[in-house]
Amino acid sequence: MLEFKNILYPIDLDSEKISSIKTALEFAQLFNCRVHILYVNDIEAGYRHPADHEDAVALKVKEVVAASLLEIADITYAVSKGDTVEEIVKYTQANHIDMIIIGHKHRGRLYASLFDSTDVKLIDNVLLPVLVIPEH
Protein backbone atom coordinates (compact mmCIF):
# COMPACT_ATOMS: atom_id res chain seq x y z
CA MET A 1 0.00 0.00 0.00
CA LEU A 2 1.18 3.51 -0.74
CA GLU A 3 2.23 5.54 2.24
CA PHE A 4 2.23 9.32 2.24
CA LYS A 5 3.94 11.35 4.95
CA ASN A 6 4.53 14.64 3.15
CA ILE A 7 2.31 16.15 0.46
CA LEU A 8 3.20 19.30 -1.43
CA TYR A 9 0.57 21.78 -2.55
CA PRO A 10 2.08 24.52 -4.74
CA ILE A 11 -0.14 27.58 -4.37
CA ASP A 12 -0.74 30.31 -6.94
CA LEU A 13 -1.46 33.55 -5.11
CA ASP A 14 -2.53 35.20 -8.39
CA SER A 15 -5.46 32.86 -8.73
CA GLU A 16 -8.85 33.47 -7.23
CA LYS A 17 -9.56 29.78 -7.73
CA ILE A 18 -7.68 27.66 -5.22
CA SER A 19 -10.50 25.39 -4.14
CA SER A 20 -8.22 22.40 -4.69
CA ILE A 21 -6.40 23.26 -1.47
CA LYS A 22 -9.39 21.94 0.46
CA THR A 23 -9.03 18.61 -1.33
CA ALA A 24 -5.31 18.55 -0.53
CA LEU A 25 -5.98 19.14 3.18
CA GLU A 26 -8.75 16.53 3.28
CA PHE A 27 -6.47 14.02 1.53
CA ALA A 28 -3.74 14.75 4.08
CA GLN A 29 -6.19 14.23 6.92
CA LEU A 30 -7.27 10.91 5.43
CA PHE A 31 -3.67 9.68 5.21
CA ASN A 32 -2.52 11.42 8.41
CA CYS A 33 0.28 13.32 6.74
CA ARG A 34 1.75 16.81 6.59
CA VAL A 35 0.86 19.28 3.82
CA HIS A 36 3.58 21.63 2.63
CA ILE A 37 2.07 24.72 1.00
CA LEU A 38 4.67 26.34 -1.23
CA TYR A 39 4.47 29.67 -3.01
CA VAL A 40 7.15 30.38 -5.62
CA ASN A 41 7.65 34.04 -6.49
CA ASP A 42 8.89 34.26 -10.07
CA ILE A 43 11.90 36.59 -10.08
CA GLU A 44 11.13 37.79 -13.61
CA ALA A 45 7.58 38.70 -12.64
CA GLY A 46 8.77 41.06 -9.93
CA TYR A 47 7.08 41.55 -6.60
CA ARG A 48 3.37 41.50 -7.31
CA HIS A 49 2.62 40.06 -3.89
CA PRO A 50 4.04 40.74 -0.47
CA ALA A 51 4.57 36.99 -0.24
CA ASP A 52 8.20 36.94 0.71
CA HIS A 53 7.10 35.47 4.01
CA GLU A 54 5.16 32.38 4.98
CA ASP A 55 2.65 34.55 6.85
CA ALA A 56 1.32 35.99 3.58
CA VAL A 57 0.75 32.49 2.22
CA ALA A 58 -0.98 31.40 5.44
CA LEU A 59 -3.25 34.45 5.26
CA LYS A 60 -4.34 33.56 1.70
CA VAL A 61 -5.06 29.98 2.79
CA LYS A 62 -7.13 31.19 5.75
CA GLU A 63 -9.28 33.23 3.36
CA VAL A 64 -10.30 30.09 1.47
CA VAL A 65 -10.23 27.18 3.93
CA ALA A 66 -12.57 26.69 6.86
CA ALA A 67 -10.95 27.23 10.25
CA SER A 68 -12.17 23.81 11.41
CA LEU A 69 -10.13 22.11 8.66
CA LEU A 70 -7.05 24.24 9.32
CA GLU A 71 -7.14 23.45 13.05
CA ILE A 72 -6.72 19.72 12.51
CA ALA A 73 -4.28 19.96 9.59
CA ASP A 74 -0.52 19.60 9.91
CA ILE A 75 0.67 22.40 7.62
CA THR A 76 4.09 23.78 6.75
CA TYR A 77 4.13 27.05 4.81
CA ALA A 78 7.09 27.85 2.56
CA VAL A 79 8.14 30.56 0.12
CA SER A 80 10.77 30.41 -2.60
CA LYS A 81 11.95 32.57 -5.49
CA GLY A 82 12.85 31.43 -8.98
CA ASP A 83 11.45 29.31 -11.77
CA THR A 84 8.26 27.75 -10.45
CA VAL A 85 8.84 24.17 -11.61
CA GLU A 86 12.55 24.16 -10.71
CA GLU A 87 11.80 25.44 -7.21
CA ILE A 88 9.04 22.88 -6.72
CA VAL A 89 11.38 20.06 -7.79
CA LYS A 90 14.08 21.31 -5.38
CA TYR A 91 11.55 21.54 -2.56
CA THR A 92 10.30 17.99 -3.13
CA GLN A 93 13.84 16.66 -2.89
CA ALA A 94 14.85 18.70 0.15
CA ASN A 95 11.68 17.93 2.13
CA HIS A 96 11.06 14.26 1.33
CA ILE A 97 7.78 14.93 -0.48
CA ASP A 98 5.85 11.76 -1.37
CA MET A 99 3.13 13.30 -3.54
CA ILE A 100 2.12 16.59 -5.14
CA ILE A 101 -1.45 17.83 -5.29
CA ILE A 102 -1.98 20.72 -7.67
CA GLY A 103 -4.97 22.63 -8.96
CA HIS A 104 -5.66 22.93 -12.67
CA LYS A 105 -7.52 25.74 -14.39
CA HIS A 106 -9.19 24.89 -17.69
CA ARG A 107 -7.77 26.96 -20.53
CA GLY A 108 -9.04 27.40 -24.05
CA ARG A 109 -7.45 25.50 -26.92
CA LEU A 110 -5.54 28.51 -28.22
CA TYR A 111 -3.96 29.18 -24.83
CA ALA A 112 -3.16 25.50 -24.35
CA SER A 113 -1.50 25.28 -27.76
CA LEU A 114 0.74 28.28 -27.05
CA PHE A 115 1.66 27.74 -23.40
CA ASP A 116 2.42 24.81 -21.14
CA SER A 117 0.71 25.06 -17.80
CA THR A 118 2.67 24.64 -14.58
CA ASP A 119 0.91 21.36 -13.82
CA VAL A 120 1.94 19.86 -17.18
CA LYS A 121 5.56 20.99 -16.76
CA LEU A 122 5.56 19.61 -13.23
CA ILE A 123 4.31 16.19 -14.30
CA ASP A 124 7.11 16.09 -16.88
CA ASN A 125 9.80 16.99 -14.33
CA VAL A 126 9.08 15.08 -11.12
CA LEU A 127 9.31 11.41 -10.32
CA LEU A 128 6.44 11.50 -7.85
CA PRO A 129 2.72 10.88 -8.02
CA VAL A 130 0.92 14.09 -8.99
CA LEU A 131 -2.78 14.45 -8.27
CA VAL A 132 -4.34 17.16 -10.46
CA ILE A 133 -7.57 18.67 -9.13
CA PRO A 134 -9.81 20.75 -11.43
CA GLU A 135 -10.43 24.22 -10.00
CA HIS A 136 -13.99 25.47 -9.95
Where are these regions (language model features)?
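Short, flexible hinge/linker loops that cap or flank conserved catalytic cores
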Residues: 1-2, 124
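Structural beta-alpha unit
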Residues: 2, 69-100, 106
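Small/aliphatic-rich secondary-structure junction motif
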Residues: 2-51
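General small-molecule cofactor/ligand-binding pocket signal
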Residues: 38, 76-80, 131
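Short, solvent-exposed loop/turn segments at secondary-structure boundaries
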Residues: 48-52, 112-115
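Short, hinge-like loop/turn segments at secondary-structure boundaries
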Residues: 52-56, 118-120
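Gly/Ser-rich helix-loop-strand patches that form or flank binding pockets
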Residues: 93-136
